[in-house]
Amino acid sequence: MRARKGGGDAVTVTARHYAATLSRHGATPSGVDWESRAAQDLRFVQLLKLCNFSRAFSLNDVGCGYGALIAHLDQFHPGCRVTYSGTDLCAPMIAEARAIWAGRPATTFVNRKGCAAMADYTLASGIFNVMADCAAETWHTHIADCLSDMGAHSRLGFAVNFIAHHAPDVPGLYRAPDGMWQAHCAAIKEATVETVTGYGLREFTLLVRFSA
C-alpha cells in the first residue's frame, strides 16, 4: 500500500465517504461500496459462520449501513430469532436503516462508533476497507480501537473481514498485513482465531471465538 501523510481522522473520513456513496446510490449495495447483493451475501455467509443458529442470540452489526444484514438473516435464517443492534458512523445511513426496518421487532439502530450494547456476537463487514486519505498509522489505530470495542461488547465472539495483502494496491483502500490482525485478535480475551479464505475474493474473514 502506498504511504500516505496527513489526511483526516478516521471517523470523519469514513462518515463523509459513506454519506457521499449513499447520496449517489441510495440504500443499495453500491451505496455501501459493494458491487452487488450477491457480493454482500457472500461476505455475510463467511461472517455468520461464527454464529450458532440452533438457538436465539443477540447480534451487534458494526458499520451496519442501511441494514442489509437483516435482509440476509430474514432470507437465509428465518427460523432463528436474532436480537439485532446496528451502529454506523454515518448519520444518513442510520436514518435510512430506521426508515427501512421501522417496526421490526428486537431491532435498533444507533449513530455512533463501535457497539451500542453487549451482545452474544458482533460482526463487521468491510468497515476497514476504505481508508481514503487517512495516514496508515491513523488507520491502524482506528482498527485496533474498533476490534477492542467489538471484543469488549461480545460474549461469545466477533467476526470481521479485510482485504488481503496480496490484493492489488488500489489508492484509498486498505490491505491488511499478513498475520497482523490475527495476532491482535488472539490477544483479546485469549481468543481462538480462525482465518477463513478460499471463497473467491482477495480477502479474508476472521472468526474470533471466546472460551465459554
Which residues does each predicted region cover?
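N-terminal, positively charged/glycine-rich alpha-helical extensions of SAM-dependent methyltransferases
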Residues: 1-28
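A short SAM/SAH-binding and catalytic strip from SAM-dependent methyltransferases
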Residues: 121-140
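Conserved beta-strand signature within the Rossmann-like core of class I S-adenosyl-L-methionine
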Residues: 154-164
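Conserved glycine-rich SAM-binding loop
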Residues: 65
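Class I S-adenosyl-L-methionine
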Residues: 170-212
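Class I SAM-dependent methyltransferase SAM/SAH-binding core
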Residues: 60, 68-108
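Conserved alpha-helix/loop element of class I SAM-dependent methyltransferases that forms part
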Residues: 38-55, 72
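A short glycine-rich, Lys/Arg-flanked "PGG" loop and its adjoining helix->strand segment in the class I
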Residues: 141-156
